[in-house]
Amino acid sequence: MKVTDVRLRKIQTDGRMKALVSITLDEAFVIHDLRVIEGNSGLFVAMPSKRTPDGEFRDIAHPINSDMRQEIQDAVMKVYDEIDEVVPDKNATSEDSEEA
């Protein structure tokens, strides 16, 4: 099974969640509500989950082997990094781009 599409929307907040993601597997199955989270050891992809009545979070969908988990992580982070490269600096002004 391969990740054939990644749709990512960055979140502009001060929180730990940095993006919401949908992935397509084999151009046939979509999983929504993955999240890019800033953890203590850097960014990682969290699977969609819901809160149980006792307050714990349980994954709704998740890979069952480490190879698939790594493929999802790599595909999502590649798109996340590409979007980071294209997003202009918030502090840049129109004069900065004219000088270049």
Curated annotation (Swiss-Prot):
The keyword Acyltransferase does not apply. Coiled coil: none annotated. Signal peptide: none annotated. It comes from the Bacteria. Pfam families: SpoVG (PF04026). GO terms for biological process: division septum assembly; sporulation resulting in formation of a cellular spore. Keywords: Cell cycle, Cell division, Septation. Belongs to the SpoVG family. Could be involved in septation. NCBIfam families: PRK13259.1. This is Putative septation protein SpoVG. It comes from Staphylococcus aureus (strain MRSA252). The gene is spoVG.
